[in-house]
C-alpha cells in the first residue's frame, strides 16, 4: 500500500510534459512576436519597452507556473529540497518580473509617457505586489524557523488558494497587456487580420491553455504529493516535534 500511495499517477507525467511544451511555446512565440513585429529587445533604445512583455511572460507566467507544479513533479524527493526549489523558482520569477517593471517605467520616463493609467497597469501592479506578499508570507510560514506544524497546516490551504489565484490573475493581466499593445500599434487595422494581430491572438490562446493546464494539474487531489512519514519541517523550532502534528500533502 505504501508503494502504491507513493507511485506516480499514470496521467500526471503527460500533463506535466504538455504544460512544459505549452510554456516553452509561449516564451518562444513571445520572442517571435517581439522580434518579427516589434524590432527585438534592447535596454538603451526605443526597444526597451519590449523587455517588459518578455520578462513578464518568462517570470510571472512560465516560471510562476512551474513553481506551482514543483510539489506535483517532485513527489519522492526530500521535502526540504522541494520547498527550497519551490521558493527559488518564485524568487527567479520575481526578479525577472522586476526587471520587466523597471524597463517599462524607465521607458515611459524617457518618452514622457504617463504611468499607471490603464487597467492593465493597475492589474499588473496589484498582481506584482500580491505575488511579493505571497512569497514573503510563504517564506515566513514554511521556510523561516519558528512556525509550528499546526500553524502551517492552518495556513496551507490559504497559501495554495492565493498561489493559484495570483497565477490566474497574472495570465489575465498578460492578456490585457497584449490587447493593449495591439490596439496602440494597429488601431483599426487590428480588425483586418494583420499578421501581427493573428500571431498575438495565437499567443493569447497559448497563454490561456498554459494557465488552464497548470491549474488542472493543481486541482487533481489524487495528484498531490503524498505525505512521507519521515518528512519534518524545515524550521529548526524543535518544540514542534512534541505537538503531535504531521505534515500534510501539498
Swiss-Prot record:
Q: Which UniProt keywords apply?
A: Acetylation, Cytoplasmic vesicle, Electron transport, Heme, Iron, Membrane, Metal-binding, Phosphoprotein, Translocase, Transmembrane, Transmembrane helix, Transport
Cytoplasmic side stretches:
1-15, 72-83, 145-157, 219-250
> What's the impact of mutating residue 72 to A?
No effect on protein abundance. Decreased reduction by ascorbate
Q: Which residues lie on this side of the membrane: Vesicular?
A: 37-50, 105-123, 179-197
Cofactor binding notes: Binds 2 heme b groups non-covalently.
Q: Where, by residue number, does heme b 1 bind?
A: 52, 115-118, 120, 180
Its localization reads: Cytoplasmic vesicle, Secretory vesicle, Chromaffin granule membrane
The answer to keyword Transcription applying to this record is: no
InterPro entries tied to this protein: CYB561/CYBRD1-like, Cyt_b561/ferric_Rdtase_TM
**The enzyme's E.C. designation:** 7.2.1.-
Any idea what a deletion of this gene does?
Mice lacking Cyb561 have significantly decreased amounts of norepinephrine and normetanephrine in the adrenal gland and brain while the biosynthesis of dopamine, the norepinephrine precursor, is normal pointing to a defect in the catecholamine biosynthesis downstream of dopamine probably at the level of the dopamine beta synthase.
Membrane-spanning residues: 16-36, 51-71, 84-104, 124-144, 158-178, 198-218
Result when mutating residue 86 to A = No effect on protein abundance. Decreased reduction by ascorbate
Which Pfam families has this protein been placed in? Cytochrom_B561
Start and end of every Cytochrome b561 domain? 18-219
In alphabetical order, the GO MF annotations are: metal ion binding; transmembrane monodehydroascorbate reductase activity
Which residues get modified to Phosphoserine?
A: 246, 248
Cofactor(s) recorded for this entry are: heme b
Which reaction equation describes what this protein catalyses? Answer: monodehydro-L-ascorbate radical(out) + L-ascorbate(in) = monodehydro-L-ascorbate radical(in) + L-ascorbate(out)
Sequence positions that bind heme b 2: 72, 79, 86, 159, 224
Q: Which GO terms describe its biological process?
A: ascorbate homeostasis; intracellular iron ion homeostasis
What cellular-component terms does GO give this entry? Answer: chromaffin granule membrane
Which organs or tissues contain this protein? Abundantly distributed in a number of neuroendocrine tissues.
The entry's function note states: Transmembrane reductase that uses ascorbate as an electron donor in the cytoplasm and transfers electrons across membranes to reduce monodehydro-L-ascorbate radical in the lumen of secretory vesicles. It is therefore involved the regeneration and homeostasis within secretory vesicles of ascorbate which in turn provides reducing equivalents needed to support the activity of intravesicular enzymes.
| Protein name (database record) | Transmembrane ascorbate-dependent reductase CYB561
